[in-house]
């Protein structure tokens, strides 16, 4: 980050791996103090995620304040707490940070779909972490734990996702407009309803 962009309350992440802060490389931090001059260059930060997950009962992951030279920080371009409002079936796309951090195979499976969100209680820290699991929208079998700085919800992604999968014959409807492929999607589920909505919008299924 640049000095002029620093502000208390901004969310940041390390812009590269540093051995001194190796345990913070994948974590989102909040700036809680800024230097008065460029020469001081040290920013006070507190960690808001644990394993990339936010907490529902305590804003910070621990009591520690970490002081980092601001040149090693990068602003997080999404609200890390947006995931608290996500639902099963929501479509996620990588953020700019996600594009830089995710592996090529992981990026090739984008966009992703929210599979489930569970509360995991860490009794050592008295912290309830929201652990959101996501899976590739292309039918990949594996799911992975969401890092809140790596993905964002995209309401417009469904249209492109539907079109690409339909023309690859990964999505099929019968003559009555009922979804028959993929068979794993349950009728009436959020994903089923979203697919049907996009099919009608694209004229594949008639109203």
Could you tell me what each predicted segment is?
Residues 4-17, 84-100:
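Short coil-to-beta transition motif at edge beta-strands of beta-rich domains
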Residues 1-3, 207:
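Short, Lys/Arg-enriched, disordered terminal segments
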Residues 44-45, 92-94, 117, 195, ...:
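Small side chains
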Residues 9, 17, 23, 101-107, ...:
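N-terminal Sec-dependent export signals
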Residues 50-87, 130-205:
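Intrinsically disordered, low-complexity, charged/polar segments
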Residues 10, 31, 37-40, 69, ...:
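Compositionally biased non-globular segments, especially hydrophobic aliphatic-rich helices
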Residues 18, 22-60, 102-148:
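Basic/aromatic-rich interaction segments and small domains that mediate binding to polyanionic partners
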């Amino acid at each position: 980050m640049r000095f002029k962009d620093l502000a208390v309350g901004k969310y940041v992440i390390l812009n590269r791996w540093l051995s001194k802060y190796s345990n913070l490389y994948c974590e989102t931090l909040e700036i809680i103090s800024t230097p008065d001059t460029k020469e001081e260059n040290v920013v006070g930060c507190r960690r808001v995620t644990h394993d990339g997950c936010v907490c529902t009962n305590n804003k910070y992951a621990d009591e520690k304040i970490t002081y980092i030279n601001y040149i090693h920080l990068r602003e997080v371009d999404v609200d890390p707490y947006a995931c608290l409002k996500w639902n099963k079936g929501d479509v996620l796309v990588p953020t700019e940070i996600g594009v830089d951090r995710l592996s090529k195979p992981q990026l090739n499976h984008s966009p992703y779909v929210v599979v489930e969100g569970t509360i995991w209680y860490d009794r050592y820290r008295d912290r309830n972490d929201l652990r959101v699991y996501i899976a590739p929208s292309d039918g990949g079998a594996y799911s992975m734990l969401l890092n809140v700085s790596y993905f964002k919800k995209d309401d417009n992604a469904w249209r492109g996702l539907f079109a690409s999968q339909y023309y690859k014959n990964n999505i099929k409807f019968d003559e009555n407009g009922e979804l028959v492929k993929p068979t794993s999607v349950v009728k009436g589920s959020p994903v089923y309803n979203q697919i049907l909505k996009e099919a009608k919008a694209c004229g594949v299924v008639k109203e």
